[in-house]
Regions:
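Short, C-terminally biased terminal segments at protein or domain edges
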Residues: 1-119
Length: 119
């Protein structure tokens, strides 16, 4: 079992979740079960999958969970775009969160590469 708190991808994705919760709190109430809920679930899925994967015994299993986290990360990116297009996020908010998304994505790619090379 791995200590997930030692992975930068986990720390960065955890921060992204908190940021997504903050900005979606300002979305229209009508979006609570739409974009707000979906965006929160997708963002939270990133560190949750990392945590679950880290608890698995083998590197192959961990790599699969990291890969799922990558998919959730891409989902969040589109949702950020959509939220800006709908006027729920300002351009500055979207760009700030997109920059954080990019950092998470890079760290996930690095982690996936490292875990995939483990025996």
């Amino acid at each position: 079992m791995r200590d997930i708190s030692k992975y930068e991808a986990f720390e960065l994705s955890d921060q992204l979740v908190l940021d997504v919760y903050r900005v979606t709190g300002k979305f229209p109430k009508a979006e609570m079960f739409g974009l707000t809920g979906q965006m929160r679930r997708a963002a939270a899925s990133i560190p949750m999958n990392l945590a679950e994967g880290a608890a698995r015994a083998g590197a192959k299993e961990f790599a699969q969970f990291v890969n799922v986290a990558v998919g959730s990360c891409e989902e969040v990116r589109y949702q950020l775009h959509l939220a800006e297009a709908l006027g729920y996020l300002t351009r500055v908010e979207q760009q700030t969160l997109d920059g954080k998304y990019e950092s998470v994505k890079k760290m996930l790619a690095k982690l996936y590469g490292a875990v995939s090379r483990e025996p």
